[in-house]
Amino acid sequence: MTPQPIAPDQSEVLLRVIEAAPQVCRRHQFFVWTQGDFQRWLPHKISICGSYDRDQRDVVFDIFNSIPLPDAVVQGLRSIRSDIVQAGLTAWRKSRSQAAVLSLRRDVLPQPLSLALLELGYDQIMVHGLTRPGRADELESFFMFAQPRAEYGEATQQALDMLLPCVHMAYQRVCVTERQMGQARTGAQAAATSRASLRLTGSPEK
């Protein structure tokens, strides 16, 4: 793929996206970040984001969509074993771990999930990812971007190539923050339950 020149106004867009990224720590902040200048750099209505979870020892996916989607589609896109995610991984690996375009019509066998997306106007999906440090065959993160009737080309692939490190770092930070907050809430709830149990049994608290 031959690098395409970037217009000055687009360079400013990319700079603003990168400058805003360090403020992204929560799931809702990630969604808001991808709806501003990010859209001018990489237009999309759906983003499917995966990150390796060391507790589950697998890549766990989440979906961010700015327009409504059927629940079955949302749940299907959250699974690493779905036909679309697997086809996206295959397309990415065939491109030697560079940004790639997945076509649902061309690259995915007709299945309920892909047919539902095609009916909604989705065909092309931009995909990209990173492998775990020192483990080239294991994913660290994976991203898929789509919008209805999109025609993604080399310019869009280059845009995602340039933005990937920033997206990766922002989403990793979100995953770590959300996990820590979830663990803190679980710990607080367990402590509250324990205190309530002690009060009911009349046992003295230590």
Which sequence ranges carry the predicted segments?
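Regulatory input/activation interfaces that engage signals or partners
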Residues: 3-9, 13-151, 155, 159, ...
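Signal-transmission/dimerization alpha-helices at domain junctions
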Residues: 150, 159-180
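Signal-transducing coiled-coil/dimerization helices and immediately adjacent hinge/linker segments
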Residues: 173-206
